[in-house]
């Protein structure tokens, strides 16, 4: 028989920097899960990723205090800001433009995000990323 699921925990954890401090410690501690076991497993799986890049993770907690976790791709906004070389998006996105990205950069971000996007094809994924960039006040060249 399958294990009984007692809950899901969704967190954004910096790659390679999981530690028992908040928000990880309290979230896992409430469910009685082994915090250090998660931190070691997460840090081991994110070794190849740029350190400090926030990685969304969904932890499935089981009744026997065991857990599994699934890592997602980094948020599109973080990847867009990194490509444009800015700290934050525009306060008035449709009037004040704060940066530029090219179609090639949109394509690269879409390839990175493709496992988590629901787009039918790569062109739709590129348009999704371009739309996110525009809503942050970033001009997309070539689209």
UniProtKB/Swiss-Prot annotation:
Listed GO biological process terms: translation
Role this protein plays: Forms part of the ribosomal stalk which helps the ribosome interact with GTP-bound translation factors.
Protein name, per record: Large ribosomal subunit protein uL11
Keywords from the UniProt entry: Methylation, Ribonucleoprotein, Ribosomal protein, RNA-binding, rRNA-binding
Gene Ontology, cellular component aspect: cytosolic large ribosomal subunit
Subunit field text: Part of the ribosomal stalk of the 50S ribosomal subunit. Interacts with L10 and the large rRNA to form the base of the stalk. L10 forms an elongated spine to which L12 dimers bind in a sequential fashion forming a multimeric L10(L12)X complex.
Keyword Signal annotated: no
Family: Belongs to the universal ribosomal protein uL11 family.
GO molecular function: large ribosomal subunit rRNA binding; structural constituent of ribosome
Free-text description of this protein's post-translational modifications in UniProt: One or more lysine residues are methylated.
Alphabetized PANTHER family for the sequence: 60S RIBOSOMAL PROTEIN L12 (PTHR11661), LARGE RIBOSOMAL SUBUNIT PROTEIN UL11M (PTHR11661:SF1)
InterPro entries given in the database record: Ribosomal_uL11 (IPR000911), Ribosomal_uL11_bac-typ (IPR006519), Ribosomal_uL11_C (IPR020783), Ribosomal_uL11_C_sf (IPR036769), Ribosomal_uL11_CS (IPR020785), Ribosomal_uL11_N (IPR020784), Ribosomal_uL11_N_sf (IPR036796)
SUPFAM superfamilies: Ribosomal L11/L12e N-terminal domain, Ribosomal protein L11, C-terminal domain
